């Protein structure tokens, strides 16, 4: 029996019954192709035309909705906290008493992700997916980012995975 990710009732569910299986979600997008298609061979921190002010505003909208939906107060890192990186902001949120995860917001293609998302409770991951859809983000499952980087950027050493390409300090 396949696991069903359900969406909280106070958030707008996706079309249908408000339930998507992980398999259905992964079949909806070809993540490997999406990562390659948005790779910029010349710009490694952000694409041409990246509007930092707009992205920061959208990140703030996500943060407010995320905190309200889950009744938690995530730690916010953005602005001067993040430099020389392929992402612009992150939310650090608790999972249990002593564990934290970070939800990162890439400078490329409105990508977002949580590193090691297999450990994130389904309620939190479902909320992230609903908010991503509502605010125009594309959630990339971490297992696709942990793969070897096969993109077109040259001249920058240390980019050996898609995680580093889109969601890490460079």
What are these regions (language model features)?
Residues 36-44, 48-49, 65-69, 73:
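Eukaryotic intrinsically disordered, low-complexity regulatory tracts
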Residues 44-60:
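A short, highly charged nucleic-acid-interacting micro-segment common to nuclease
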Residues 2-18, 119-170:
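Acidic, proline/glycine-rich low-complexity IDRs
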Residues 30-33, 61, 127:
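Exposed alpha-helical structural elements
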Residues 2-46:
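N-terminal, Lys/Arg- and Ser/Thr-rich interaction peptides
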Residues 60-113:
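Amphipathic, interaction-prone secondary-structure segments
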Residues 49-52, 109-120:
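Short cationic amphipathic helices and targeting signals
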Residues 55-63, 121, 125:
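Well-ordered, non-membrane alpha-helical segments in soluble/globular domains
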